[in-house]
A protein has these predicted regions:
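An N-terminal, globular interaction/scaffold subdomain
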Residues: 1-2
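Long acidic/polar interaction regions in large eukaryotic complex-forming proteins
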Residues: 5, 9-27, 144, 152-155
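Alpha-helix capping and inter-helical loop/turn segments
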Residues: 5-6, 114-115, 190
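A contiguous, surface-oriented mixed alpha/beta subdomain in the mid-to-C-terminal portion of proteins
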Residues: 29-182
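Short, recurring structural edge motifs at helix starts
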Residues: 88-96, 193-202
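Non-catalytic, well-ordered alpha-helical scaffold segments
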Residues: 100-104, 193, 205
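Long amphipathic all-alpha helical oligomerization modules
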Residues: 181, 185, 189-198
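Conserved small/polar residues in nucleotide/adenosyl-binding loops
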Residues: 203-209
Length: 210
């Protein structure tokens, strides 16, 4: 089971047009204080300041906080989409991505960091799509990475009519998302799904080239 190794590269254009802060200042920041200064007056300022005031924190904590904030905001915006088909497609796509971000984090925490259940839960995105609460609890309670993978293979992502992976498949974010897009695009060929699938393929292709 592997992470997606995401890395963001900014070269102007789209990001600079749509960001509500000085993107170059953010990319040039060499400390958390400089980063906070670069986003002063935006929705990110209070989030980063709150974390900065915590007694114990690391750069990873900031990354987790921003990820959680992003996914919570996306999920909230999806609920506002008026077209039912589009809303359901977005829920399936982003819900699957959130499930697997949480699964990958739990796996890494168990395999590489030997973290306790409370610390793992602290960094989880509080949204679930196809993972039931009982399954998440069971996964959190596993004692080894091997046991964790065994339990993941018993979830809806591997079993039932809506399964997107085969039992022998390697557990990776890329594989899950590509399979999910394939299923959705086959069912909804004239929807927003093919556009999102194209963007996903561009992203995974760029990540593979790095």
């Amino acid at each position: 089971m592997e992470g997606n190794g995401r890395e963001i590269t900014v070269s102007g254009g789209f990001f600079e047009r749509h960001a509500d802060f000085d993107l170059k200042a953010v990319m040039a920041a060499n400390s958390v204080q400089e980063l906070i200064q670069a986003v002063t007056g935006t929705e990110y300022e209070s989030l980063l300041k709150e974390l900065e005031s915590a007694a114990e924190k690391s750069y990873a904590d900031y990354a987790f906080a921003l990820d959680i904030y992003y996914y919570k905001k996306v999920w909230k915006e999806i609920t506002k989409v008026s077209d039912k088909e589009t809303r359901q497609i977005l829920e399936q796509i982003f819900g699957t991505e959130i499930d697997w971000q949480n699964l990958m984090w739990m796996y890494r925490a168990k395999r590489f960091y030997s973290m306790g259940e409370a610390d793992v839960k602290k960094h989880q995105i509080p949204v679930s799509c196809r993972l039931r609460s009982a399954e998440t609890k069971r996964l959190l309670e596993t004692e080894t990475a091997e046991q964790f993978v065994e339990f993941v293979r018993q979830t809806a992502y591997f079993r039932g009519k809506q399964a997107v992976l085969e039992p022998e498949d390697e557990l990776t974010w890329e594989r899950v998302m590509i399979r999910t897009y394939e299923k959705i695009c086959k069912k909804h060929p004239m929807s927003v799904a093919p556009v999102l699938r194209y963007l996903c393929l561009l992203y995974t292709s760029d990540a593979a080239d790095e």
